[in-house]
Amino acid sequence: IKDNVLLEYKRWILADIMPKKEVEIPYGVTEIGEKAFKNCSELKKVVIPDSVVKINSCAFLDCKNLIEVKLPENVTEISFACFSGCKHLRTVVLNGKLDNIDMFAFANCKDLEYIDFPNSIRKIDEFSFCYTGLKKVELPEGLEYIGGEVFMGDENLEEVKFPKSLEIIDAKGYLFDECPNLKKIILPKGFDLDLVYDDTVSIEYYE
């Protein structure tokens, strides 16, 4: 830790004999550095204090046994590939101040079946939830931008609901590549969905 920034987690404790499965970051740390926990394959749970306001790119990249994460209340962005490759991540608790989910943030989180998005989110960037276990997604009211291939490779994805607030789908037509089980897309009435999807997908509209 330097200047309240956790730069790197030293994964081995007890004279380098026993890997630690749960880590509690001390209160007072304000930032988690880039790749700080990268490849900590033994880590199952990390407790992040509310003093943390920034989690940098790839901070938890390939922590393959990480099961749960609760985002501190003052973090406004999930950075590039922050939790990418956390294939056993099942529980993600987001806060009410989160504004942006960056590229590849949760890519390859195979066990992630559901996520509750707060209405504070304005932007979800491309590839952010590709190759996850998501089954049903309700995008939050307040969301304005969604990037391309966000749900690419989500083989279990069955249903997606878009909010009235959405202004830009920067997907060049593609948002649901490799989503063979997609059955339903729910849209606000009058919304023009210029996307490529299978003919078997039903479109529903709401007021």
Range-by-range predicted roles:
Residues I1-V5, I17-E31, S41-K54, K64-E77, ...:
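Structural signature of tandem-repeat unit edges
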Residues K10, I168-I169:
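Short regulatory "switch" loops immediately downstream of catalytic or recognition motifs
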Residues Y9-I17:
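Eukaryote-biased recognition of intrinsically disordered, low-complexity regulatory segments
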Residues F129, V196:
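Soluble or luminal CAZymes and related metallo-dependent hydrolases
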